[in-house]
Amino acid sequence: MALLQIAEPGQSPQPHQRRLAVGIDLGTTNSLVAALRSGVTAPLADADGQVILPSVVRYHADRVEVGACAKRAAAADPFNTISSVKRLMGRGLADVKQLGEQLPYRFRQAESQMPFIETVQGAKSPVEISAEILRALRERAEAALGGELVGAVITVPAYFDDAQRQATKDAARLAGLNVLRLLNEPTAAAVAYGLDRQAEGVVAIYDLGGGTFDISILRLTKGVFEVLATGGDTALGGDDFDHAVADWILQQAGVSEDLAPGEQRELLKIACDAKERLSVDETVQVAYAGWAGELHRETFDALIEPLIARSLRSCRRAVRDSGVELDEITAVVMVGGSTRVPKVRSSVGQLFGREPLTDIDPDEVVAIGAAIQAETLAGNNRDGEELLLLDVIPLSLGLETMGGLMEKIIPRNTTIPVARAQDFTTYKDGQSAMMIHVLQGERELISDCRSLARFELRGIPPMVAGAAKIRVTFQVDADGLLSVSARELASGVEASIQVKPSYGLTDGEIARMLEDSFRKADQDRDARALREQLVDAQRLLEAVEAALIADGERLLSAEERAAIEAQMAELRALLDSQDVSAIERQIKRLSQITDAFAARRLDSTVKAALAGRRLNDIED
């Protein structure tokens, strides 16, 4: 009789059997899957020996094509052939419209505000389209490894916000993949280079792919790998190089009218081919719409120089945020196919003052790093090695307080996973509910930050203003996903929410938020000071008004009451002004003139409490 094999759920009954896990680079232009085979971590090839899978999906009436075959049909069937879908992940239709002519698709908006693309198979969401790419990679991996996967580490740009990360996890679930972790692409690149096992130092990861740019500054300390700062641009990459070349070709060819989707696809293919050849050759021949000519590398460099400059500005900002100097950076790692462009490499080298590292294929390095991390998370690390990855959140998280102010709970560039709590209180007497408004951004006023979610805490016991204590806790998990809870400590009533925005940030919005916070820091500080003084003034006026109604006639003379009311009137008159100092001075005057009144009220309360009681009763 055979013995029953018993194991923990999800674990192998054979202790020495490897659990099959992979790393996936879900890219804008190309995607890859990698795994450990025969002691070497490398990308997995398809039946034709190709490791790169173009991130292109074509819908037929009865089937779906993914990869090179779909890419070849892009010009002939543009409406049913979807590329660069990563740019649409976690976005709303309003964001998509800003991309304009770069997206030659027919969009339809659903109730969820997610954009849907009309195809011959019906409307498809970016999540569904991305799932087709992930499904193709899963099937390739299971065929190559000879078994079912226990999970995958999937990489995302460091600047992906909560909505974009959640959309990626949803796509993986549709594709039948268990997500072991979402890993920032620059972090994966550092893992691939084995930087965690090298000497201590500071490393910059410059990641320029097809559609996104990321820069990360990493510190290596005794095997601990920490991301000090991140930056980037969610709408900058090799696709933009293609569009710059395409615009130049149209200008040279004298074409001014709008192109049909198929014509636009063909033009972008010509532009992309020219870009790739210029990484090797100094001059390439280009022909389009009856025009033929030469494109020199010098001209190409001039076309893309503004785009490279955008990436370098993000680099300088990330270095400043990290708290290190440029000359402290000991290595610069290049990631992403667009870093093959000589002008990119020379510009980055000039900024950091050293030759960038390009040892590993920039198209494969992210998938390799993800696969190494997947091995660890799957429990296959036989040597007992553990990799400590400390990613960071890109923008501060907080909530709204009185006066429309943003109170930061978790500052940007805080390592994750993380949990932070802060206590708040009620503003009015008898307040039994509190609205929690969760925000993301760097500015002081909520009008300048991004709203993530709202939820209400009900059942707060009625108390005087300021007596209740509400503890608000923010938790960000290892995938960068946020949950917020609020609990009234006396009664234990609690409410919580997992933040799942219906769409993500618009193009460049994160960069704009950071730039605004730096440029308008003084203005924001003044605005916050004014709002805080206005809140204090309003709170004081309401408290004094309530005290006058309750005890004014009993404890104050007519002259004293008139003096207090005169100071209250002066403070009210200042509420519409912008004079912070004047409001602060008047708050002090009103506080001082009511000190004696407050003392009398306290004495009266104590006397009432002690009336009819003996000293021995009190001592007992």
Swiss-Prot record:
It comes from the Bacteria. The lineage of its organism: Bacteria, Pseudomonadati, Pseudomonadota, Gammaproteobacteria, Pseudomonadales. GO terms for molecular function: ATP binding; ATP hydrolysis activity; ATP-dependent protein folding chaperone; unfolded protein binding. GO terms for biological process: iron-sulfur cluster assembly. Pfam families: HSP70 (PF00012). Chaperone involved in the maturation of iron-sulfur cluster-containing proteins. Has a low intrinsic ATPase activity which is markedly stimulated by HscB. NCBIfam families: HscA, PRK05183.1. This is Chaperone protein HscA homolog. Keywords: ATP-binding, Chaperone, Nucleotide-binding, Stress response. Belongs to the heat shock protein 70 family.
